[in-house]
């Protein structure tokens, strides 16, 4: 099978596509076929060597796919289930303690591979109405926007939200805020991206 590796000392020129053996499966792990991955700024920082990683680390923190095989102790998933990643696979519930916040794609191998072995708790179900490609964008950018608007911002209908830039988090924030009945103002230096934001229901634009 194939996977992308970041070889020391990092840099885009040190991203290598390698043929490797299929991963072995621990009792509490599943074998997952990757159908889609998404790129976040975190992944660029890892690739450039700005976030320290082990040599030959497999990058990408977000991915979606289906279960090919399950370990003997796995109870949450069955073969054929459609699943996607979570940002912090070791943080299942309770307070977000530092020791639980290991991140896929830098502390542990990520989703830039055809097949991976991963703990069953590191995945969640893909909503039935989403494709693999759509689901792969949710874990980092989508949940960051949700936490900012809902958990921290307590956004209400008819309030105004300023979205700075047109990256993944901003585009999610725009759509979530519109769904909640808020007015959205956006800033961007890209006419092309602003045209896309208009299609998504942007209220007011600043360039």
Predicted regions, residues:
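Short N-terminal binding/cap micro-motifs at the start of the first secondary-structure element
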Residues: 11-15, 41-43
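Glycine-rich beta-strand-centered segment in the early N-terminal region that forms part
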Residues: 21-37, 47-92, 110, 127-129
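Alpha-helix/helix-capping structural signal
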Residues: 37-39, 72, 121, 143
């Amino acid at each position: 099978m194939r996977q992308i590796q970041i070889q020391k000392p990092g840099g885009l020129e040190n991203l290598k596509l390698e043929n490797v053996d299929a991963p072995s499966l621990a009792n509490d792990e599943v074998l997952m076929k990757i159908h889609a991955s998404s790129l976040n700024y975190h992944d660029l920082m890892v690739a450039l060597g700005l976030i320290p990683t082990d040599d030959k680390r497999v990058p990408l923190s977000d991915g979606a796919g289906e279960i090919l095989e399950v370990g003997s102790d796995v109870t949450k998933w069955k073969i054929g289930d459609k699943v996607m990643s979570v940002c912090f696979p070791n943080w299942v519930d309770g307070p977000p303690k530092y020791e639980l916040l290991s991140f896929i794609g830098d502390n542990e191998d990520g989703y830039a591979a055809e097949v991976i072995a991963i703990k069953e708790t590191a995945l969640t179900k893909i909503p039935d109405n989403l494709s693999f490609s759509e689901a792969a964008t949710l874990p980092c950018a989508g949940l960051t926007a949700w936490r900012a608007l809902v958990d921290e911002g307590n956004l209400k209908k008819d309030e105004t939200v300023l979205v700075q830039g047109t990256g993944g988090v901003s585009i999610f924030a725009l759509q979530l805020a519109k769904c909640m009945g808020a007015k959205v103002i956006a800033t961007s230096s890209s006419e092309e991206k602003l045209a896309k934001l208009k299609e998504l229901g942007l209220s007011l634009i600043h360039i």
